Swiss-Prot record:
InterPro entries: Kinase-like_dom_sf (IPR011009), PP2C (IPR015655), PPM-type-like_dom_sf (IPR036457), PPM-type_phosphatase-like_dom (IPR001932), Prot_kinase_dom (IPR000719), Ser/Thr_kinase_AS (IPR008271). The active site is at D156 (proton acceptor). It catalyses: L-seryl-[protein] + ATP = O-phospho-L-seryl-[protein] + ADP + H(+); L-threonyl-[protein] + ATP = O-phospho-L-threonyl-[protein] + ADP + H(+); O-phospho-L-seryl-[protein] + H2O = L-seryl-[protein] + phosphate; O-phospho-L-threonyl-[protein] + H2O = L-threonyl-[protein] + phosphate. GO terms for biological process: L-ascorbic acid metabolic process; regulation of intracellular signal transduction. It comes from Oryza sativa subsp. japonica (Rice). Its EC number is 2.7.11.1, 3.1.3.16. This is Protein kinase and PP2C-like domain-containing protein. Residues 390-647 form the PPM-type phosphatase domain. Keywords: ATP-binding, Hydrolase, Kinase, Magnesium, Manganese, Metal-binding, Multifunctional enzyme, Nucleotide-binding, Protein phosphatase, Serine/threonine-protein kinase, Transferase. In the N-terminal section; belongs to the protein kinase superfamily. Ser/Thr protein kinase family. In the C-terminal section; belongs to the PP2C family. ATP binds at I38, A39, K40, G41, S42, E43, S44, T45, V46, K59. Mn(2+) 1 binds at D426, G427. Binds 2 magnesium or manganese ions per subunit.
Length: 657
């Protein structure tokens, strides 16, 4: 790797609890550089990086609490024992270095070109041969058998955590939830009550993983074992065989997410898996899968963990199945197969595109022909009141695996002291529309002058962004940079523009903005959802179907709840990007503005929000974080993004009542 490993006695983490003779645990800043992000979750971001001149993947954890830091050191201890260079296993993503000292805690792994197995199945719509499925299953089972021998339970096996190399060999990654079996049992014993069941605190820390891959005993709040990993393995291999997201009949993951929400609540799905024995639809014999493979999958997801085979048994059975598969099955190295399922040298798919860059480039490339004079020049400058702003934000994935929200804060926009802009974009069916919009909308706003009113500027920015994004999407689909079929990402949007003492808020969808006016909530937005009779009537007049599905009114085959958005080209023109703009004159009665995605408003009322800020130190970033974390604690199932803007001077030492 080109990075020297210090002597073991000095090669240790900042605490001294981690040490290694195989990999460096602290690195000089000049030896590595982080490039572009590859993936982002609630607990970490993975970057493409350079280490000693070589391409690697760098995992940067989110360390918000001392527990997070403890977890980093535990994971590092586990990884360098399991994955040091001298104990390399071909089925595991290899740890090659770490930086275990502040301020940049990092882990470096071998780099694998995207996509992971989940994106390979659901984005590229890869149809592997049965031979390929069995070979991948065998390699994965061997890696999990190796972990089991070492006494380790992975606890989060799913296609998204399986990396595929150029020869289609799998490499298990993301050991963020992995634990030694003895440690899981130790924690459980400490938390058991006289009833013999773990406490609620234990459940919250240990009922981890991804719901559709979690074994029934975990959903019943028992502890993880090797057999829990066996269950997740079976769900994943069946998904590879069928090509559909578990418990749906859809290939596209973003669309399947919507279908799952429409079909089951989380509690209903849990009950069906545990009590009714619900499992994903098993691959059909017509797929070419031998009965022995289908039988193995069914035994692996048996409701009784004791009836499931061990990974040692699974590996032996898969070897036998491999020998009996027809010789003329497509081999992993078949050039014809590579051509049919996607050239291995080209890894373009929708998330590989930088939609952030696309939005910024489009705004810059479509400048308006006008002389620049600013809105602040045309408003009454004799007004004695002008708000004094301080601002902050906080964003979290919440209970979702991926982050589809984006936001921007542009205080003193265009270097004007009385001109400020803030915005939140809540993506659905992927993050592409939200990423494009977060650069395009403020880019357009910067170009408008006093000949266009702020209301018209906001409206035009939304509409132009919508058109530009949909045209860009079509362009990339035609050029094959996007390979997924029937992909129609969109986002809701709320943007606030403060011009001297006037506030303008544009909204399309179900994000919200409220003012604290004289101690009472003053709404600056109205939700645009199909449950609103006026919005529903407008959609129907445009010729698009609105029907009651599961729990609410939804629009079209995509079953969207919102009736206005940027993107969603399959539902245009009914689901319009035309925002509703509300304006008001600010006064000393206006204390702060709160903007948030629906992940907050799903579990909090306007009054709740004001009350929480009242009881929080008056620092906008801290208030934003308090609101988001409280929403997560109340059970919000969505991404949560919050912006708080104080409109008059506040002291962080202000007394809390």
């Amino acid at each position: 790797m080109g990075v020297e490993v210090p002597p073991e006695e000095s090669n240790r983490c900042v605490r001294g609890c981690c040490r290694s003779a195989a990999i460096p645990l602290h690195l000089p800043p000049s030896s590595f550089s982080l490039l572009s992000p590859i993936a982002k979750g609630s607990e970490s971001t993975v970057y493409e990086a350079r280490l000693g001149g070589e391409r690697v993947a760098a995992k940067k954890p989110v360390l918000s609490t001392s527990d997070d830091l403890d977890k980093f050191h535990y994971q590092l201890q586990l990884l360098w024992w399991v994955l040091p260079i001298e104990l390399d296993h071909p089925g595991l993503a290899r740890l090659v270095a770490a930086h275990a000292r502040p301020p940049n805690y990092l882990m470096f792994f071998d780099f694998f070109e995207p996509p992971n197995l989940a994106d390979k199945i659901h984005v590229e719509e890869w149809n592997p041969s049965v031979q390929q499925v069995v070979t991948i299953a065998t390699d994965l089972a061997k890696a999990l058998q190796y972990l089991n021998i070492l006494g380790i339970v992975h606890r989060d096996i799913k296609p998204a955590n399986i990396l595929i190399d150029k020869d289609f060999h799998p490499h298990l990654a993301d050991f963020g939830l992995a634990m030694y079996q003895k440690d899981i049992k130790h924690v459980s014993v400490e938390n058991w009550r006289s009833s013999g069941k773990p406490t609620g605190g234990f459940h919250k820390k240990n009922m981890v993983g991804t719901l559709i891959y979690m074994a029934p005993e975990i959903l019943r709040k028992d502890i993880h074992t090797e057999k829990s990993d066996v269950y997740s393995f079976a769900i994943s291999i069946n998904e590879l065989l069928t090509g559909v997201v578990p418990y749906t009949d859809l290939r596209a993951e973003a669309q399947a997410h919507t279908v799952l929400e429409m079909t089951y609540t989380e509690q209903q799905l849990t009950a069906a898996i545990v009590s009714q024995g619900l499992r994903p639809a098993l691959a059909l014999p017509e797929s070419g899968a031998p009965p022995s493979l289908l039988s193995l999958i069914q035994r692996c997801w048996d409701s009784d963990p004791q009836q499931r085979p061990s990974f040692k048994d699974i590996t032996e059975e898969l070897k036998i199945i491999e020998k009996h598969i027809a010789v003329n099955s497509c081999s992993l190295a078949s050039p014809a197969n590579k051509s049919q399922n996607g050239n291995t040298e080209v890894h373009h798919y929708q998330e590989a595109l930088s939609w952030l860059n696309q939005g910024e480039l489009f705004a810059k490339g479509n400048k308006l022909d006008s002389t620049v004079d600013h809105w602040s020049d045309i408003f009454d400058q004799s007004s004695k009141y002008c708000p004094t702003l301080s601002w902050g934000s906080f964003a979290t994935c919440g209970r979702r695996e991926t982050m589809e929200d984006t936001h921007f804060m542009l205080p003193h926009m265009s270097e004007e002291k009385d001109l400020h802009a803030f915005g939140i974009f809540d993506g659905h069916r992927g993050s592409a529309a939200a990423e494009f919009s977060v650069r395009a909308v403020p880019g357009f706003l910067k170009q408008f002058n006093s000949n266009t009113s702020p209301t018209d500027a906001l409206t035009e920015a939304f509409v132009r962004t919508d058109i530009a994004f949909r045209e860009e999407l079509i362009l990339h689909q035609k050029s094959k940079r996007i390979t997924q079929k029937n992909w129609h990402p969109g986002c809701t949007a709320v943007t606030a523009l403060i011009v001297r003492n006037k506030l303008f808020v544009a909204n399309a969808g179900d994000c919200r903005a409220i003012l604290n006016r004289a101690g009472e909530p003053f709404p600056m937005t109205r939700d645009h959802v199909a449950s609103c009779p006026k919005e529903r009537e407008r959609i129907v007049k445009e010729g698009t179907e609105v029907k009651w599905q599961i729990d609410t009114w939804r629009v079209g085959a995509a079953a969207l709840q919102v009736t206005r958005s940027i993107g969603d080209d399959d539902l245009k023109p009914a689901v319009t990007a035309q925002p509703e703009v509300i304006e008001t004159i600010l006064s000393p009665d206006d204390e702060f503005l709160v903007m948030a995605s629906d992940g907050l408003w799903d579990v909090m009322s306007n009054e709740d929000v004001l009350s929480i800020i009242k009881d929080t130190v008056k620092e906008p970033g801290m208030c934003s974080k308090r609101l988001a974390t409280e929403a997560a604690a109340r059970g919000s199932k969505d991404n949560i993004t919050v912006i708080v803007v104080f409109l008059r001077p506040v002291s962080t030492a202000e007394r809390i009542y």
